[in-house]
Structure formats: C-alpha cells, structure tokens
C-alpha cells in the first residue's frame, strides 16, 4: 500500500513525540516530498532536523514554512533558533523579533531573542 503525505506526516509526528527524531526525519521527508507546499510538514520536519542536530537543514525547512505561512510564529521561532545554532546571530534576530511580536507571552521566544541580541 502506498503511503499518503498525511500518513507519513502522522507517522513522523508520532515518532517525534516518542523521542525518535531520526526516524521521524525519514517519515517527514517522505511527507515533504509528496506535499512540498504544506507548511505544517515543513515546520515539523524542521523540528525533527533541529532535534537531530541538523541545524542548517532545520533552518531551511523553517524558512520554507515561513514562506508558506508568514504568520507561523513557531516556524519563525524555530528559524531563529536554528540560525543561532549555526552561528548566525544577526540573521536570527528578525524571525525572533517577529515571533515575539506575534506571541509576546511566550518566554522561550523572548529568551531566544535575548540570546540573539
């Protein structure tokens, strides 16, 4: 039986929730290849890459998620964190400032922005 993007996405989410980010990457890459313009898939794949230490790949996926959905505060946050991890503090500031502006109550967003400044 051929896997649909939704099935692969659900599998990836389950694996990520069960602390199996490497396995989640495989499922989520399959979902992304089937539905490359789904922001939720791109964001979740970014989270999986981040949790496996693949920060450049994570920033690429979070960036694409933001292109698809510019008001996705979590994708902006993930993009900023990923850029911080690859040493791009100046590049991290803009997405983190936007994430904080959208969700000022999120301590993690404000903390990450402080780290970037």
Model-derived regions, located:
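Structural signature of tandem alpha-helical TPR/SEL1-like repeats
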Residues: 17-30, 52-64, 86-98
């Amino acid at each position: 039986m051929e896997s649909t993007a939704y099935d692969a996405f659900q599998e990836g989410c389950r694996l990520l929730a069960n602390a199996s980010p490497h396995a989640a990457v495989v499922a989520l890459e399959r979902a992304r290849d089937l539905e490359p313009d789904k922001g939720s898939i791109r964001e979740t794949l970014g989270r999986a890459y981040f949790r496996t230490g693949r920060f450049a790949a994570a920033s690429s996926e979070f960036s694409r998620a933001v292109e698809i959905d510019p008001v996705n505060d979590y994708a902006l946050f993930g993009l900023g964190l990923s850029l911080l991890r690859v040493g791009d503090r100046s590049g991290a500031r803009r997405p983190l400032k936007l994430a904080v502006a959208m969700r000022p109550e999120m301590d993690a967003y404000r903390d990450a922005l402080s780290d970037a400044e």
